[in-house]
Amino acid sequence: MPTVSGSENKTIAGFMFNWVKDNCNLPTDFTYNFNFTSTGSSISFVPEKSIGIYEWDVCGNYEAEFPFSIIIGVSATDDASRMKPYIIFDTIVEKLDEVTAKIWDYNSGFSINIDSTKTVLKIEQISTPVVIRQGEDNSIDVQSLFKLYYEKEVH
């Protein structure tokens, strides 16, 4: 699968980080990180690999996919705190499903523009959340994979 330029990768990654942070009703008492995880209550956005182009048209327009992870870290001192990442992921997925439904309802006129040439087609969760780290201090990191699909129009 062909990939896009490094600058387009940066644009898309930065857009998605800020969009998820600003639009998914996430907790305000968490630290937000781009491309790294930290200790304590944190939500990290990690691009998984380069954006892949999966469809071209005769004019040079294309559709591409951007895989990314969200990693939620908490101090898990009891069952309720161990469940917090999963509840946050549910909130994120509900918002993504709602937005994707609006995008695909052509009568709504709703769209998310990344910039003047790129428009979001769909954002979806592609894996269930899993614990990827458990610290000796009872902290845990829970990760889920997502994918943004977008189209770029060549002007």
Give the location of each predicted region:
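Charged, amphipathic alpha-helical segments and their flanking helix caps
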Residues: 1-35, 51-155
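Charged, often glycine-rich, active-site loop that binds/positions anionic groups
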Residues: 40-51
